[in-house]
Amino acid sequence: MDSGKIFEKLLHLAVGRGITVRFCPFQASEGRLRGNRLGIAQDLNIDKINYNLAHEIAHSFLHYDKGNMIESPKREEYEEQADRAANMILEIIKTAFR
C-alpha cells in the first residue's frame, strides 16, 4: 500500500476517535497530542508523517488518562509503548488493506 493511502487510513482512524489533525510549524518535536488535537510537524516526508500520526494515535489509546506525559517520570516508558503500538498500527493497515 502506498504512503498516501496509509495516511488516509490513519487520518480516518484519528477522526473516528474524535481527534482533529493539523500540520504545525513545530521545531522541537515531530508530533504532539493534546486532548483531542493532534499536531504533526509540517516539514516531514510522508513516511515520517505516517509514523508520527500512528504514534500519536497510539498515545490516544494507551495514555488518554495519564495527564501531561511530557513532564511525567514515566515519559520514556510511555514513548516506548507508543512506538511499539505505532508499528503495530502501521503493520495492521499495510496488511489489512492491501
Model-derived regions: residue spans:
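Active-site hotspot residues in diverse enzymes, especially metal/ion-binding acidic/histidine motifs
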Residues: 1-98
